[in-house]
From Swiss-Prot:
This is SUN domain-containing protein 3. GO terms for cellular component: meiotic nuclear membrane microtubule tethering complex; nuclear inner membrane. Residues 1-47 are nuclear. The gene is SUN3. As a probable component of the LINC (LInker of Nucleoskeleton and Cytoskeleton) complex, involved in the connection between the nuclear lamina and the cytoskeleton. The nucleocytoplasmic interactions established by the LINC complex play an important role in the transmission of mechanical forces across the nuclear envelope and in nuclear movement and positioning. May be involved in nuclear remodeling during sperm head formation in spermatogenesis. A probable SUN3:SYNE1 LINC complex may tether spermatid nuclei to posterior cytoskeletal structures such as the manchette. It is found in: Membrane; Nucleus envelope; Nucleus inner membrane. InterPro entries: SUN1-5, SUN_dom.
Amino acid sequence: MSGKAKARRAAMFFRGCSEDASGSTSGSTLLSEDENPDTNGVTRSWKIILSTMFTLTFLLVGLLSHQWLKETEVPQKSRQLYAIIAEYGSRLYKYQARLRMPKEQLELLKKESQTLENNFHKILLLIEQIDVLKALLRDMKDGTDNNHSWNTHGDPVEDPDHTEVLDEEMSNLVNYVLKKLREDQVQMADYALKSAGASIIEAGTSESYKNNKAKLYWHGISFLNHEMPPDIILQPDVYPGNCWAFPGSQGHTLIKLATKIIPTAVTMEHISEKVSPSGNISSAPKEFSVYGITKKCEGEEIFLGQFIYNKTGTTVQTFELQHAVSEYLLCVKLNIFSNWGHPKYTCLYRFRVHGTPGKHI
């Protein structure tokens, strides 16, 4: 082979190698350029995923924080709200309690004040009558010659000793009138008087009338009750509303007396129509009977009498027992059969028992 042929072959060899090298280089370059879009896409996907997870985590933390704040703040606000509602509720019920004061009580106060005023005028009138009586007696004294002495000039001279006697007589008369005014009308001992030791036996007594208007309420719960107990009938304080009421027109009560007595009479008392807030006394008892109980209030019932309380009569009415007994009794039972027309209840103000006490208590 000649030298030119070798040189030509070598040049071709090196040319092919350079082309292969350049081709591989360009291929690798193209490959890397083809691979770059895939790498960039993966990176963007991860960024999106991470940002989404971060956002979700942030939102979740915020939601949990908001829920926790609600759970801590709302109960406190609720308690404050309930406290405010309770306070205003109590004020409202207090106001309602004041407004719930029945008009009857206001009328009752007016009636009582009017009664006191009338009594005051009666006392003033009585004092005036006493003064007139004094003047008349003195005029009678001055009109008698025996009550005067004459001086030398013919002028009458009043006898001081006689004047003192007359003043003493007038003073005794005034004291007698005042004593009669203070004395009880019945003028008999009351052995059913609570202050003397008498009492009501609840087991033998009817239930009291339940009057919702006589109660005060707070949040729907009654906490004050103005109903009168049965033993109010054993006390001398008789004024409108101060009575024991039982439902309907029939009821009974068992009274343990202050001491053993042989009963002879009973007294029933009610208020007058003039001082009644309603203008009538239809709740007053009408027909009633009285029994004596032997053996410590648990024995046989002994009939003592049946009577009628007259509402048009005096307020204090005494009844002599129709059946006399010879043994001493400690308990008396009062049975009421009817009233004077009230449809809901009967009201008993005072009941007294009179008689002869035993020698030993």
